[in-house]
């Protein structure tokens, strides 16, 4: 089936399952299919369940680095937890010149303070002006752009060599958008 027909069929199958009132288990490697059809998703690796939850929970709050990398596209930053409170944490990453600030705490007692911060490309903005915040941004240059119709995927290289993927909706036919070799800032919110 072509993509358009496959998507329509997925929605029809979900409607039939709901009308009949049965529980179905479906095994797929197609992430879009799983996110479209399921109200609960289980992510497995090496025969073990890594995480079970709604598609929104799996995508927005992955329980592990493996789940974050497996579902969708993600930018990962390894770093050290330098502050951990009930309402926030800060992570310093050698890939970034500024700390990452997250508006909820991890509250771990682990001795190893190393961790990963995962940022989805669509959660990142690409301003040309330097953000005023002391956290959650980095300067870089547009290294490459993939135009994908409804959105463009920007690859921004930072001074440390880190490549950060940023997704921008193509809401205007033509606009004043960054292009190759432009100096830009990548910026994201606290959560």
Where in this protein do the model-derived segments appear?
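ABC ATPase nucleotide-binding domains
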Residues: 1-69
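Residues located in well-ordered beta-strands
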Residues: 54, 66, 78-80, 139-141
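Elongated periplasmic alpha-helical coiled-coil
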Residues: 70-73, 80
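Non-catalytic connector elements of ABC transporters
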Residues: 74, 84-191
């Amino acid at each position: 089936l072509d993509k358009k027909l496959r998507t329509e069929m997925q929605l029809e199958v979900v409607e039939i399952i709901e009308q009949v009132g049965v529980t179905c288990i479906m095994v797929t490697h197609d992430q879009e299919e799983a996110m479209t059809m399921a109200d609960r998703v289980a992510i497995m690796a090496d025969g073990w369940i890594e995480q079970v939850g709604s598609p929104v929970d799996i995508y927005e709050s992955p329980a592990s680095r493996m789940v974050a990398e497996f579902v969708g596209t993600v930018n990962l930053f390894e770093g050290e937890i330098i502050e951990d409170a009930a309402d926030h944490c800060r992570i310093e990453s050698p890939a970034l010149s500024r700390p990452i600030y997250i508006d909820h705490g991890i509250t771990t007692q682990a001795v190893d303070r190393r961790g990963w911060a995962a940022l989805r490309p669509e959660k990142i903005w690409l301003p040309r002006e330097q953000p005023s915040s002391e956290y959650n941004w980095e300067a870089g240059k547009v290294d490459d752009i993939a135009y994908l119709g409804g959105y463009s995927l920007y690859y921004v290289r930072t001074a440390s060599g880190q490549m950060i993927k940023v997704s921008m909706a193509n809401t205007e036919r033509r606009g004043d958008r960054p292009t190759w070799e432009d100096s830009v800032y990548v910026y994201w919110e606290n959560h």
